[in-house]
Amino acid sequence: GTILECTPKDWDFSFNLNARAMYVAIRAAVPKMLEKHAATGSWASIINMASIVASIKGLPNRFVYGASKAAVVGLTKAVAADFVQKGIRCNAIAPGTVDTPSLADRINAFPDPVEARRMFVARQPMGRLATAEEIAPVVVFLASDESAFATGNVYSVDGGMTI
């Protein structure tokens, strides 16, 4: 919904799920990453899941989701800046609409799920939804040494939604 439909409970749920969860996980992992870097010189990689519906692009009726995913982008860049000289890289992936069980739940909540799915697909320039298998190689790249010089970046995998 819009800001007018977003209750404080909706706001808290979305921010807890999308931003706070990443904060908690990163805060727990960073001390061990720092220890390992100090002992071995090896670098660690944090990969966050943002969305193109964040600071990259706004979509109607996605107010709190977009705001919470924009927080993920900010968190990613802040962590990258804080730890770039301490052996930790931090990047985010910003997918477009991915065909997941979560999306299926949202679609099935519409009065006409067939029409809802058609609407989700229609906003994709490629004419289809992404699959998790299309996002996974970006995760592998960011976790690997192939991306050793990348930090603080947001990688869009959106089927052309942002062009």
Predicted regions mapped to residue ranges:
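Substrate-binding pocket helix/loop in short-chain dehydrogenase/reductase
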Residues: 2-3, 7-12, 120
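Active-site helix of classical SDR
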Residues: 26, 68, 76
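Alpha-helical segment proximal to the catalytic Tyr-Lys
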Residues: 31, 81-82, 148
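Residue(s) in the substrate-gating loop at a strand-loop-helix junction
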Residues: 51
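Short, small/polar-rich loop/turn modules that mediate ligand/substrate recognition or access, typified
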Residues: 84, 89, 150-152
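C-terminal helical subdomain
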Residues: 92, 114-146, 150, 159
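Short, flexible catalytic-loop segment of classical short-chain dehydrogenase/reductase
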Residues: 95-106
